[in-house]
């Protein structure tokens, strides 16, 4: 006689067996229970083997998914371009703009042009710039000094260590730019590559290094693969990513850090306002770039964009409150921060005049590309622009040279406030057509190949 408990157990076994049959049939596999019955194996053992195989298969599939997610992101060959978005003649008139730009031409023809002057001048003028005087380098010549070791060697001599540093990691070619190592090097990490991106240099552009010709893509890959969210200088790396891969929503660093545009925005906003290069202004410029590109590439969620807008709006409020009656700012532009006011004795290495030119020019530059919703009242940039025009007009030639990197931001800002690139203004005044795209001739044997050692990731500055 079969008990009620035995009957229930038998029904349960039959039910479980039918569920397994259905699941296996749905998966397009043979029923393990029927296979077991045919082969004489216990049903339980076959089911366990099938489940183990399924779990192992899912684990393998998920591992492959994770590995694919961590593959380096692919950039675009052509960079995005940041555009001037307003024309406000009260900030600077046509006549004033012509006068300013004439004084700020890149008159660097001759031996040993400082590389930080060259890369600042390139992003200021663009590769299209041509000038009528013999002492000024054209935009093409400026770019060649940064991307062709032959031109660099001609200017700096064979004994100078090369600016371009080629190497490989496995089968991946790399190019680094020698940085913070004297007048023949760049002054900031990734500044040169960001400048090349801003003037529209494609990643297939040929770079003539001491070790041979390589595409600019090798410099991008080095920046991407060496990047860390804890770098001491990350503003220009952020700009490189924004311009060459704005369509990429997230990626992983080689350290395993997940990077999104929101993560980068928070990184830019988390420091004290005046901290960082040029009293924090390059972080503000990068945020303004993000907002402009967000309109096309949807970098942010609505909430993240609102957070960046609110941050920059607060910055503009502070700038309105701290603007000098004459129209300028200096290193104390943020006013009082969460940990107190800026120190009264704050002064940069080039003195108060340099600080004022730096802070005012940089401020007008990021405002020139920012959306209306973050800008201050109309009179604030007008006063700043008119102060810059008067101050630049009063500088001696020696002071122009001394402050050139600061002034490159001021000149570019003033042109952008008239809705044009500096090279376009020169073309309007001279009647000369902007220079078209030019690429260097094939490489020739070069020196210093053995000296072109690639800096390691450990050499990156940390905060």
Where are these regions (language model features)?
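N-terminal intrinsically disordered, acidic low-complexity segments at the extreme N-terminus
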Residues: 2-29
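Preference for long, amphipathic alpha-helical scaffolds in soluble/luminal domains
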Residues: 20-22, 28-463
